[in-house]
Amino acid sequence: MTNPLSFTLWFPLLGAIAIALIPRRQVDLTKMAALVISLVTFGASLMILQSFRDGEPGFQLTTSVPWIPQWGITYTIGVDGISLWLVLLTTLLTPVVILSSWNSIHKHMKGYVVAMLVLEFAMIGAFVALDLLLFYIFFELMLIPMYLIIGVWGGTNRIYAAIKFFIFTIAGSLLMLLGIIYLVFLGYHSQPGSPSFAITDLYAMSVPMHAQVFLFFAFALAFAIKVPLFPLHTWLPDAHVEAPTGGSIILAGVMLKMGTYGFLRFVLPFFPQASARYAVLFGVLSVIGIIYGALVAWVQPDMKKLVAYSSVSHLGFCVLGIFAMNQTSIEGAILQMVNHGLSTGALFLLVGVIYERRHTRLLADFGGLARTMPLFTVFFIIAALSSIGLPGLNGFVGEFLILSGTFRSHPVLATLATTGVILSALYMLWMVQKVFFGPVTNPENEAIKDVAWNEVVAVVPLIVMMVWIGVHPSTFLKKMEPSVQQLLATVNSRRDEPRVLTTSNPASPAVVRSAGFQPAVSLASSRPRLLSPEAGRMPAVRPAGSRRSETAGASR
């Protein structure tokens, strides 16, 4: 595989198969093999970053192989500025998870790391899939290893939490499958030829408004459950509390981003008119989730549950930024997805460190840990300040962009969402004060050991990334900017189209150009910029036998 994207996708799965052949008693070999495989995958993802060309809005490093050509189904993958950082976040957190589980998983270690590597494969696949059915397969595949991670290696109520997680997510996914079939059916009957599941073909298809409303909610419900967006969040606290530390890290760090990513990749460009109609509804639900999650987090006696409810609040900011539907807010939402993965992943890791030593997560059982665990205290406070959004750390940049962009389109919602920032400072600082400061009142906290080598190696990269994004966010923003501009050009060029079903509307040539990855001017950008023709000339990736490939080619 000369394409680093293909290698990054398939190597974890091949590694999982190889580890499955290791004898069960070779625990040390199993752990070391899993760590090496995850590190090699991360190294390959850095090659993706190196190969990624700035200024090009289209998908890069694409691979397309016909799979079921009669139905226009292909194995097509690629990466753009929206998915690039999420792929890197996935490959970064996987070795962190394996290191954090080095001494904490005491049964079926081989099964645990195999499940983690299969989960990594599925998550990367969902981020890079450019065929809608292929995306759905990866989206569903993620459920199986995460269900096992919670149900086998979780806490006392792990079976209940695993089943609740599975039922919530599969219910939304089945509705999305119905929406996928209906969407492709509409395209098939709009023009003679073979159907197509290619995302680029579906971008170029205008859907009548009555169909858009159903399809919008079919897709949006599946992604809202995954975020999770209030009031569909009730599965998340149980899953986090019962999951092992590694499961919580990967669930909060990556899996929840499938929901916000789905809104950006599918909901907005597929159904722009319905998205505009219901943007305020999703903005209101986001603000309710921001405030509700923060208030409930503030009263939690359990550290892990506190961090879990903080995810409901923080990811509400991401959904708010997405449905503000301008360049500033969407760039902030993408960056905040990465920020949340780093800061909340670090917090779950560090809560797991305490739990392994004291076998309790209750705030009342701690106090004065700054004296007995000084290095751990430094790590935890940095992660907490990052979650709060302290200037100089990553959380500030994402929240600032989201609120700035939202204020332009929905000033009332932006003002209300600002209270979530204040509340997050209150509950995070309250937790820090209860755990780390004051006298050591519990004798069991006197002899508690500071962080071990594997815990230091796991958390330091996350801390470094928090500081890097906070100090130099342009490194990340400049790679996503052209793709965000193109997304908004696609959405805005279709919001005022006649509400009839067509696959090549002459009134909106920007749609076809955007589907073919030709550069376009962002109509909603707060920083409008005309991309040069040379900057974004990427050929559209189209399945064999696609009925729209000639149309798109003629448009180009």
Please place each PLM-identified region on the residue numbering.
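Helix-coil boundary and interhelical linker segments in multi-pass alpha-helical membrane proteins
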Residues: 1, 78, 124-130, 264-278, ...
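Transmembrane helix-loop-helix hairpins at membrane boundaries of multipass inner-membrane proteins
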Residues: 1-4, 21-114, 191-204, 507, ...
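Central hydrophobic cores of alpha-helical transmembrane segments in multi-pass inner-membrane proteins
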Residues: 7-21, 35-48, 89-101, 119-120, ...
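Juxtamembrane/interfacial segments at transmembrane-helix boundaries in multi-pass membrane proteins
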Residues: 52-74, 174-233, 238, 263-281, ...
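Predominantly late transmembrane helices and immediately cytosolic-facing juxtamembrane segments
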Residues: 230, 344-347, 415-447
